[in-house]
């Protein structure tokens, strides 16, 4: 059984593109898949995988046809630690990281939205 939740973030600013988010939760396991993009193509190919370990979060990259950046790894680690689950992520946000404060705020809003999606799906 799985649960699919999709959300579009609109920042109300024509200079900041909308972000499309999809979260898939596999039940009864604790695996979570997260895709996010603010460009015309959806992320595909590689995934960052994080799993909670005994003392830290273990992270690896699952290589596919595309490539991922540090954002995918960062989000995967944050979500894995918070929810004590296996988290697979592929995030494609336009802009330079982490030096662009405007785009960095988009990442912050995206991760908040993903956390909200996961928490609200627990109660339903």
UniProtKB/Swiss-Prot annotation:
One biological process term in Gene Ontology: proteasome assembly
A cellular component annotation (GO) from this entry: nucleus
Keywords: Cytoplasm, Nucleus
Molecular functions (GO terms): protein folding chaperone
InterPro entries the record matches: PAC4 (IPR032157)
Residues in the signal sequence: none
Pfam families: PAC4
Chief location of this protein within or outside the cell: cytoplasm
Gene3D superfamilies documented for this protein: 3.30.230.100
Subcellular location: Cytoplasm; Nucleus
Name of the protein described by the UniProt record: Uncharacterized protein C24B10.16c
Organism this protein belongs to: Schizosaccharomyces pombe (strain 972 / ATCC 24843) (Fission yeast)
